[in-house]
């Protein structure tokens, strides 16, 4: 087996099953291998079967302390052999961000459970994918891990949609991401939150870092503590109460109202100037061009972003220990950039850990 395939198959961490019975009780029925009580409680909370509003969310995903979770939920048809179950959720935990891959695999596992009514077949398929990267079954469809490239998952969102909603204000999101600030996104529908938040890391494509994404967070003490341990993040919420938690964000996006708010404490670092205006115009121009694909828009933004780092390069020098490049603040000040540009470059150097300690 190719080394890349071996690496790919080692990404899954576990599989679990949650059921809602005819009495309306929701139970954690089975998992492989075992899981912690904390993670089990988190997954029960994320699974829509425990939700009081009784809305069915076919697929949700998110991250908790570097573990990604993917949950597919279905209603059990009357014809199924699962007579005492009205709904069930299949949960997969993994080390990687790839919603399309795990949505496809959980759908196959759902079909297996509907047909056999026992987790045994699911476990066999899970182990097959874990060890070989493939599971094949005539009636339930086959799944091949390597069909789902991580890069494809990174490109699956739509920057064009974000720009059509926020226009020039998209540059606020770009600036916040460049400076590794904390972005909180609210919308009452989890699907809208997930679609929007998963796209944001693509605005800073040079980092290709989706570990900053926490697309489904509850206002739960343990989850918030885990979130606040991260330096910068993109966090999605469906509870408007999060707007009253300024300790959680530098930038607040109310998707439902199409509003972006910069928190008072972040205003100094996020002050906008000529550089930001140019960046905003480029983002809007590129995204509104019907000839350009999503990946082309990302490329345009990445090239302009590289220019910003090129601006920073002349003011950096090798640190005393020779380990990394650090900012020469005097050289930056002597250049006499407009205040907003100098301020941004300084904060960018801080975000890139280029300040002298």
UniProtKB/Swiss-Prot annotation:
Transmembrane segments: none annotated. Coiled coil: none annotated. GO terms for cellular component: late endosome. GO terms for biological process: endosome transport via multivesicular body sorting pathway; protein transport; regulation of early endosome to late endosome transport. It is found in: Late endosome. Changing residue 27 to E: Impairs interaction with CCDC93. Keywords: Endosome, Guanine-nucleotide releasing factor. InterPro entries: FAM45 (IPR042431), Tripartite_DENN (IPR037516). Pfam families: SPA. GO terms for molecular function: guanyl-nucleotide exchange factor activity; small GTPase binding. Its main location: other. PANTHER family: DENN DOMAIN-CONTAINING PROTEIN 10-RELATED (PTHR28544:SF1), PROTEIN FAM45A-RELATED (PTHR28544). Interacts with the coiled-coil heterodimer of CCDC22 and CCDC93; the interaction is direct. Interacts with RAB27A and RAB27B (GDP-bound forms preferentially). Guanine nucleotide exchange factor (GEF) regulating homeostasis of late endocytic pathway, including endosomal positioning, maturation and secretion, possibly through activating Rab proteins such as RAB27A and RAB27B. Promotes the exchange of GDP to GTP, converting inactive GDP-bound RAB27A and RAB27B into their active GTP-bound form. Belongs to the DENND10 family. This is DENN domain-containing protein 10.
């Amino acid at each position: 087996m190719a080394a890349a395939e071996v690496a790919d198959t080692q990404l899954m961490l576990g599989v679990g099953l949650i059921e809602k019975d005819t009495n309306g009780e929701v139970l954690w029925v089975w998992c492989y291998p075992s899981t912690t009580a904390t993670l089990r409680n988190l997954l029960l909370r994320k699974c829509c079967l425990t939700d009081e509003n009784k809305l069915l969310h076919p697929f949700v995903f998110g991250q908790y302390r570097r573990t990604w979770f993917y949950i597919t939920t279905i209603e059990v048809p009357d014809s199924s052999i699962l007579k005492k179950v009205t709904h069930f959720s299949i949960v997969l935990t993994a080390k990687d961000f790839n919603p399309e891959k795990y949505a496809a695999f959980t759908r196959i596992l759902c079909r297996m459970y509907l047909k056999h009514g026992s987790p045994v077949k699911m476990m066999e398929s899970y182990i097959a994918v874990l060890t070989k990267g493939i599971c094949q079954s005539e009636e339930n469809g086959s799944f091949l891990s390597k069909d789902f490239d991580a890069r494809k998952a990174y490109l699956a969102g739509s920057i064009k949609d974000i720009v059509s909603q926020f226009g020039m204000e998209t540059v606020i999101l770009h600036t916040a991401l460049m400076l590794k600030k904390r972005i909180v996104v609210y919308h009452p529908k989890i699907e809208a939150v997930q679609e929007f938040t998963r796209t944001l890391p693509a605005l800073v494509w040079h980092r290709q870092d989706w570990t900053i994404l926490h697309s489904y967070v509850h206002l739960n003490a343990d989850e918030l503590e885990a979130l606040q341990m991260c330096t910068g993040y993109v966090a999605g919420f469906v509870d408007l109460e999060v707007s009253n938690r300024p300790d959680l964000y530098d930038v607040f996006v109310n998707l439902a109202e199409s509003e972006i708010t910069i928190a008072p404490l972040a205003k100094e670092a996020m002050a906008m100037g000529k550089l930001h205006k140019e960046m905003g115009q480029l983002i809007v121009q590129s995204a509104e061009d019907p000839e350009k694909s999503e990946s082309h828009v990302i490329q345009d933004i990445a090239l302009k972003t590289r220019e910003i780092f090129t601006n920073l390069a002349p003011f950096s020098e090798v640190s005393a220990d020779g380990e990394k490049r650090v900012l020469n603040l005097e050289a930056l000040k002597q250049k006499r950039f407009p205040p907003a540009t100098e301020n941004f470059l300084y904060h960018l150097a801080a975000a890139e850990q280029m300040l002298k300690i």
